[in-house]
């Protein structure tokens, strides 16, 4: 490779958006066995507020209260989505996951706000994701050909669908995630 070819190759590599780590989105998770002393909702809210420089398009929180999951998410800044009134309506639990989105795939819409909450035969799963699934279009097309119905345009839903498929075949969520990889 001569110097010109080398320079062109490097320029092309620099333009490739998914070959390096990027700062996109903010993701936070918390588990507290004893939720009587501190609020997982408040801690998740404060974490998202601190992380919102990583994504100001939309945000959301899913709380798990003994297997019952509730979500609150919308477009906007953390302080716009999680008003005092909205926060007071979110039930406490022992686990929560929060996400603030910097959209790199999918449209700017409420349906693409994360975490996604997926209900299936073996229960429910909340999923938040930072980054891009580089083969999302191909996987989505394959899943749709096999009957999958998608509710948003985010690549996170592709990941959620694959993990859910694996979860229905195995004994634990941990094994399902490993199988999906």
Model-derived segments and their meaning:
Residues 1-181:
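Conserved short alpha-helical segments that host acidic/polar catalytic motifs at enzyme active sites
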